[in-house]
């Protein structure tokens, strides 16, 4: 299968490319390196050093014997997207190329607008390129469980069968996202569903939970194949952040009561889910939705798990919640679709957390401690960037 990965230089895009390549698929990458630019803007860098994309691709060719063409450009340039899709002629497009941080989108007006422009316009350009070139191309799009919010009912996988005043229908599950980033993902989902309905496109929307981890089977093969590890208050996911705080001897900072419950997933399972979705494509005209996570935990449960696993003393500190969200709520989400396709989950365990501790210990001199604390407050319309250059 010919697979085009949008955002192929990113935290998830790069290990996904390796995972698909080693399993016999022809893979090409698209990126504009804006994620690396955001490191400069924020004054913080990946905990684990990451090579340039040129060096990564060259190393992969040496290690595996497999080449991966690279296209450099911005998905907001619709003509360029058309050109890339025509040139590579993929069977599947995996779309990671979006600004992925809720706090970043809530910094101020400029960052909110940039997030929505990048994410929504870029995805629209991809949809138009598929419709113009080959409507059989399968779009595998990374969404987020954050689209749903925390409703007081069970969350279904994308669609809801309902009966209202004696009539029945099937509708998209109601969305109540908690940031301008999450809203951009909702807009994407609606746009993709509409494109499937009017153009007969085939798409799989993967509403992913909070990702943790840094290593996959393929990234371990050479240091130049490593993917990034973000721990800061803007891009760092909660488990990655807690492991850094534990290693540094800092309290694990839980926002508010800590009852915020989310689906979580190991990065090893993320790449597995993408492959399973790509190898079992949606049918023409289908907007298929899977909830992509393997277990659900509250923030406090995650903190307690990390604290119990760390060999030293680790305290848990409750801090004022910078976000506007429910801190104690019902949460139960369906996630059987990917299991039915063959997903074998890697659940959170002491062994896995120990591996994160080792990564953090190995690179702790690269940590900027001031970048860990939250500085973006949802109720403010202008936030300062701590540590920015």
Listing of model-derived features with the role each one plays in the protein:
Residues 6, 117-120, 181-182, 232-236, ...:
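Short, solvent-exposed loop/helix junctions and linker helices
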Residues 186, 198-201, 213-240, 248-250, ...:
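Glycine/proline-rich active-site loop of Rossmann-fold NAD(P)-dependent oxidoreductases
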Residues 187-191, 195, 242, 302, ...:
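Hydrophobic alpha-helix immediately C-terminal to the catalytic Tyr-X-X-X-Lys motif of short-chain
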Residues 246-389:
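C-terminal substrate-binding subdomain of Rossmann-fold SDR/epimerase-dehydratase oxidoreductases
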């Amino acid at each position: 299968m010919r697979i085009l990965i949008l955002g192929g230089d990113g935290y998830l895009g790069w290990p996904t490319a390796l995972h698909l390549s080693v399993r016999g698929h022809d893979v090409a990458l698209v990126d504009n390196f804006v994620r690396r630019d955001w490191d400069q803007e924020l004054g913080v860098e990946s905990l684990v050093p990451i090579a340039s994309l040129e060096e990564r691709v060259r190393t992969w060719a040496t290690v595996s014997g497999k080449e991966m063409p690279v296209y450099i450009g911005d998905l907001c340039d619709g003509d360029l997207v058309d050109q890339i899709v025509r040139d590579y002629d993929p069977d599947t497009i995996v779309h990671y190329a979006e600004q992925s941080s809720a706090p970043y989108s809530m910094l101020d007006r400029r960052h909110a607008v940039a997030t929505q422009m990048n994410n929504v316009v870029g995805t629209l350009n991809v949809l138009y390129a598929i419709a113009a070139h080959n409507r059989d191309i399968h779009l595998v799009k990374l969404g987020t469980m954050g689209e749903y919010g925390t409703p007081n009912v069970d969350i279904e996988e994308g669609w809801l069968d309902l009966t209202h005043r004696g009539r029945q229908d099937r509708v998209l599950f109601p969305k109540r996202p908690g940031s301008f980033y999450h809203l951009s993902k909702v807009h994407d989902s609606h746009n993709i569903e509409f494109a499937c309905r009017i153009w007969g496109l085939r798409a799989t929307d993967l509403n992913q939970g909070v990702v943790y981890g840094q290593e996959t089977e393929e990234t371990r093969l050479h240091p130049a194949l490593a993917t990034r590890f973000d721990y800061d208050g803007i891009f760092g996911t909660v488990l990655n952040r807690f492991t850094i705080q534990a290693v540094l001897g800092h309290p694990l900072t839980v926002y508010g009561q800590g009852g915020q419950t989310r689906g979580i997933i190991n990065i090893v399972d993320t790449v597995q889910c993408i492959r399973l979705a790509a190898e079992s494509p949606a049918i023409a005209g289908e907007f298929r939705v899977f909830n992509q996570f393997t277990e659900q935990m509250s923030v406090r449960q995650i903190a307690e798990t990390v604290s119990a696993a760390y060999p030293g003393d680790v305290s848990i500190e409750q801090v004022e919640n910078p976000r506007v969200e429910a801190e104690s709520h019902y949460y139960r989400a369906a996630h059987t679709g990917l299991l039915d396709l063959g997903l074998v989950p890697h659940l959170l365990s002491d062994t896995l957390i120990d591996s994160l501790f080792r990564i953090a210990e190995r690179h702790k001199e690269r940590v900027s401690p001031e970048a860990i604390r939250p500085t973006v407050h949802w109720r403010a319309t202008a936030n300062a960037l701590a540590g920015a250059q």
